[in-house]
């Protein structure tokens, strides 16, 4: 079974467009296609109460929780705005994601 096609990839810079962390931006740490979620650095930080196990120390840890994929947009480096993407075919035949507004390529 093939996974879902998502508009963001790991290490992309995204902006949150809805929710309590609206207008915050950060780098995508990981993607969860089955749950339609992305974990963004410094966004949606929650406190987790960790019990001590073995050599690990317990306590209250802060970590990022997933944000739904529909609540993030890719940040264009040239426009410096959240943008939609389109897929274009490059000269060498490879597909790349590009900004709809300015045409800047996100894939290197």
Swiss-Prot record:
GO terms for molecular function: rRNA binding; structural constituent of ribosome. The keyword DNA repair does not apply. Belongs to the universal ribosomal protein uL24 family. HAMAP family: Ribosomal_uL24_B. One of two assembly initiator proteins, it binds directly to the 5'-end of the 23S rRNA, where it nucleates assembly of the 50S subunit. One of the proteins that surrounds the polypeptide exit tunnel on the outside of the subunit. Part of the 50S ribosomal subunit. PANTHER family: MITOCHONDRIAL RIBOSOMAL PROTEIN L24. SUPFAM superfamilies: Translation proteins SH3-like domain. Gene3D superfamilies: 2.30.30.30. NCBIfam families: rplX_bact (TIGR01079). SMART domains: KOW. This is Large ribosomal subunit protein uL24. Keywords: Ribonucleoprotein, Ribosomal protein, RNA-binding, rRNA-binding. It comes from Citrifermentans bemidjiense (strain ATCC BAA-1014 / DSM 16622 / JCM 12645 / Bem) (Geobacter bemidjiensis). One of its GO terms (cellular component) is ribonucleoprotein complex. GO terms for biological process: translation. The keyword Cell membrane does not apply. InterPro entries: KOW, Rib_uL2_dom2, Ribosomal_uL24, Ribosomal_uL24_KOW, Translation_prot_SH3-like_sf.
